[in-house]
């Protein structure tokens, strides 16, 4: 039974149309729906449209959509839940009367609304008559945002959420701790943000330049601010997964609490980039106590099923020399320092499991052995993910070769006036070539739970550059993670972006990269 209606004031309408008379679909959607057919006469885009909702929850969802739409003119909508559909599945029927969107849950309805938004931007005074049936290939469609190498405000994190959410991304992996800055407030460990959140200066130019700006850089997120981000994302059907690095990338934390390092002194918040020997002491009982304190508070803020525990780029040179670490190895019968990392990971996983949570870690966590319940995020190519899937572990594919969006976007960045980046060359077309199932048989493919694009910010000091590096490459992540085997050919995909997304990028003022569209 319909119990609520939303009356909306509207300001303006935009762009192209679909010819229903010919029953030909001439609108584009990214990612491309599983089924889209032209039918009926369509729905007028009204100055004062109505959103007819089946429940109060859908009424709130409709109000959020109006906010995200940003004041453009809209057609009438009818929103409902269809329990026969899968959670993120939706149908859209705009043959007459209203744009009727049914989802298997609020998430399904939301993705239907995002599809409708792209179509509205291609319409003039009528939303075309269409029948759409659609659902994602993968349940995890992620975007990682590093807010440690450079700090970004809460408002900018919200802008990031809206930007990737437009592409049906449903996970924000929030990278919160690093050598160059600790960002989350932990009330029981106040020095983490009092000391660890600020570095005295930042490298200028590429790694090895030995030139610094002489300006302190830092910032942190209060617990209330982080809860605000969680709520903001949830209203847009996104989950926020926090990352707390362990045992490496520890310089900022050890500057605040040096007694937790193997050396016990001499630490500082790093001012340059790279991998550092500073590491939490595996043989110090205080290390696990520290992480448990941190995670107690993190779990109160973030309700996500998963907590990311890092695990990448953890040099073991200090463990090799540390009497406490060597004593622990002898006690446990270990033959490799890699097992010390597994000791930390497995203890933390058990602790989080007791709280009803699961862990994700970068693929290095495989090196000393992991439990079957750990999810592996494969970043050093796909080999780690393939190995994990063959072992029966769940996997998120996030390879540098396809989805490290801090890489340059053209082969000649200087000639193309690209902003300074870490290196490499990752154009949109290369992203689009990724096959998440390559090297796996049908049974092993079931362990690939999703795909993620990562944005590391060593060379991204401004939010405008964040947009430039994400757009339009995040659309490739969206198309593969949503459509996968049914994705369109690359030229069609680019044309779809031009029709369906560029008008929205332009209207929102996004600083998108133009290279893929230059003829």
Whereabouts are the PLM-identified features?
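Soluble non-cytosolic domains of exported or imported proteins
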Residues: 56-59, 107-110, 151-155, 220-224, ...
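Flexible loop/turn segments at secondary-structure boundaries
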Residues: 151-153, 179-185, 247-253, 308, ...
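Flexible, acidic glycine-rich loops studded with aromatic residues
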Residues: 358-364, 369-374, 380-519
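Acidic, contiguous N-terminal accessory segments
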Residues: 20-136, 141, 353-366, 370, ...
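Active-site-proximal beta-strand/loop segments in catalytic clefts of secreted hydrolases
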Residues: 54, 103, 176, 243-245, ...
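Active-site neighborhood of glycoside hydrolase catalytic domains
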Residues: 253-259, 268-374, 379-390
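Bacterial Sec-dependent N-terminal signal peptides
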Residues: 1-27
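Feature activates predominantly on carbohydrate-active enzymes
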Residues: 23, 85-278, 282-306, 347, ...
């Amino acid at each position: 039974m319909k119990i609520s209606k939303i009356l909306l004031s509207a300001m303006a309408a935009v762009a192209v149309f679909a010819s229903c008379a010919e029953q030909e679909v001439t609108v584009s959607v990214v990612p491309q729906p599983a089924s889209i057919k032209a039918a009926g006469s369509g729905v007028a885009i009204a100055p004062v449209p109505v959103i007819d909702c089946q429940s109060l929850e859908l009424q709130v969802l409709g109000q959020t959509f109006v906010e995200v739409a940003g004041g453009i003119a809209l057609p009438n909508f009818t929103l409902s839940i269809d329990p026969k559909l899968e959670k993120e599945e939706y149908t859209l029927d705009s043959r007459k009367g209203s744009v009727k969107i049914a989802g298997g849950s609020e998430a399904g309805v939301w993705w239907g609304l995002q599809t409708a938004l792209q179509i509205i931007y291609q319409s003039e005074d009528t939303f075309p008559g269409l029948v759409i049936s659609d659902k994602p290939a993968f349940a995890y469609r992620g975007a990682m945002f590093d807010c440690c190498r450079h700090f970004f405000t809460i408002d900018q994190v919200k802008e990031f959420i809206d930007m990737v959410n437009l592409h049906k991304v449903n996970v924000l992996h929030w990278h919160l701790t690093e050598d160059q800055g600790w960002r989350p407030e932990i009330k029981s460990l106040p020095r983490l943000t009092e000391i660890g959140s600020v570095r005295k200066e930042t490298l200028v130019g590429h790694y090895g330049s030995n030139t610094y700006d002489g300006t302190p850089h830092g910032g942190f997120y209060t617990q209330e601010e982080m809860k605000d981000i969680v709520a903001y994302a949830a209203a847009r059907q996104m989950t926020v997964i926090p990352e707390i690095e362990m045992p490496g990338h520890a310089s900022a934390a050890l500057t605040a609490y040096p007694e937790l390092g193997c050396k016990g002194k001499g630490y500082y918040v790093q001012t340059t980039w790279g991998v550092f020997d500073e590491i939490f002491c595996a043989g110090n009982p205080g290390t696990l106590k520290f992480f448990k304190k941190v995670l107690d508070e993190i779990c109160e803020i973030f309700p996500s099923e998963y907590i990311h525990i890092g695990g990448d780029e953890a040099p073991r040179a200090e463990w090799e020399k540390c009497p406490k670490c060597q004593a622990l190895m002898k006690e446990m019968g270990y033959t490799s320092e890699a097992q010390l990392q597994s000791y930390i990971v497995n203890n933390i996983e058990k602790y989080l499991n007791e709280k009803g949570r699961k862990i994700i870690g970068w693929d290095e966590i495989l090196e000393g052995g992991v439990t079957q319940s750990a999810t592996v995020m494969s970043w050093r190519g796909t080999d780690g993910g393939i190995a994990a899937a063959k072992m029966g572990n769940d996997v998120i594919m996030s390879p540098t070769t396809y989805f490290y969006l801090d890489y340059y976007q053209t082969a000649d960045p200087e000639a193309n006036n690209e902003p300074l980046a870490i290196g490499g060359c990752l154009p949109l077309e290369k992203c689009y070539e990724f096959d998440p199932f390559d090297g796996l048989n049908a049974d092993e493919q079931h362990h690939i739970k999703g795909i993620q694009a990562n944005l590391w910010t060593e060379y991204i000091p401004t939010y405008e550059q964040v947009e430039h590096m994400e757009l339009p490459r995040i659309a490739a992540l969206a198309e593969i993670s949503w459509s996968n085997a049914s994705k369109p050919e690359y030229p069609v995909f680019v044309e779809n972006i031009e029709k369906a997304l560029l008008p929205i990028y332009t209207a929102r003022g996004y600083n998108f990269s133009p290279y893929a569209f230059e003829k």
